[in-house]
A protein has these predicted regions:
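Feature recognizes metal-dependent phosphohydrolase scaffolds
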Residues: 1-290
Length: 290
């Protein structure tokens, strides 16, 4: 591109527009995004456990941090809910302005200082690439990460999301665990479990592992730590495999039954409505089609 050509800005604008259209019209990408919106969320409560990515923004004293979103302040669960609302408007809204606001909020969720998903004061990617001064590379983390062993704080987070702090767990993703230096993914006596811990290859020199998998069955919960995968070539030539170590998190005092799970509750609810329907037919409240 000639830097002295007057038409260059228009050329670049058209180029960016075409690039945008390629992304928006990509069938596979749209299918993936649709899947994320239909199955995903800012957090999930599953079988009495709280799953989220990043952190719950906290003040240094452990109280929930107030974050301003569109002129109003939110904290704790309400912050997650309002951010998810806007993220969904960014995809589903018919009004162009409303959809644009939602898309701006998705950007904020990714890199905003008050975002639970980001959890830092700033993103210093630019500084790390282009500035030699290491001081500019620092990304100050939210106070949450210093309070992972605080039982009162972890209990208040579980209660904020409507869970029993005596039995529930927090399953926390996107937190590197430096196992190479003896750090454990099990925090606060087993109330908080980290399941990322180095899954990304970029973190593996720092963590010494390739992440964790949480396994939960009728008898208990355990974390499986995975060794980094070297390469396909090494796996063939050396006949090596990915080795994993298990860490027992909790053994249940009694075995969990299907009825104790969210799936079991859904089955029980379906049984209830089917029995109600059957009773209505038997009593003649609903007439059979002949």
């Amino acid at each position: 591109i000639g830097l002295g050509i007057p038409a260059e800005p228009l050329f670049r604008s058209n180029y960016l527009l075409r690039l945008q259209q390629v992304f928006m019209r990509c069938e596979k990408l749209q299918r993936h995004v649709k899947f994320l919106y239909s199955k995903g969320g800012m957090y999930k409560i599953y079988n009495g456990n709280l799953l989220y990515h990043g952190c719950v923004p906290l003040n240094p004293d452990g109280s929930f941090k107030q974050v301003e979103i569109c002129g109003k302040e939110y904290s704790g669960k309400a912050l997650y809910d309002i951010l998810e609302y806007y993220a969904r408007r960014g995809y589903y809204a018919k009004d162009a302005k409303e959809r644009a606001l939602g898309q701006d909020m998705i950007w904020y969720i990714w890199a905003g200082p008050g975002s639970p998903v980001f959890g830092k004061a700033k993103m210093a990617t630019f500084e790390r690439y282009f500035l030699e001064d290491k001081e500019t590379h620092i990304e100050e983390k939210n106070s949450y990460y210093k309070l992972l062993e605080n039982e009162e704080v972890i209990g208040s987070i579980l209660e904020e999301f409507g869970l029993d702090k005596a039995d529930a767990h927090i399953v926390n993703g996107h937190v590197p665990v430096e196992q190479i230096h003896g750090e454990s993914p099990i925090k606060c006596g087993g109330k908080l479990l980290i399941i990322d811990g180095g899954f990304s290859k970029a973190y593996q020199k720092k963590t010494g592992i390739a992440g964790y998998t949480l396994v939960c069955n009728s008898r208990g919960m355990r974390l499986v730590a995975h060794e980094p995968f070297e390469s396909t070539e090494a796996a063939i030539l050396k006949e090596s495999d990915i080795f994993s170590d298990s860490i027992v998190v909790e053994n249940f005092s009694r075995r969990k039954m299907v009825a104790d799970t969210d799936t079991g509750k859904e089955i029980q609810e379906n049984i209830f409505y089917l029995e109600e329907l059957l009773e209505a037919y038997r009593e003649g409240t609903i007439m059979e089609e002949v």
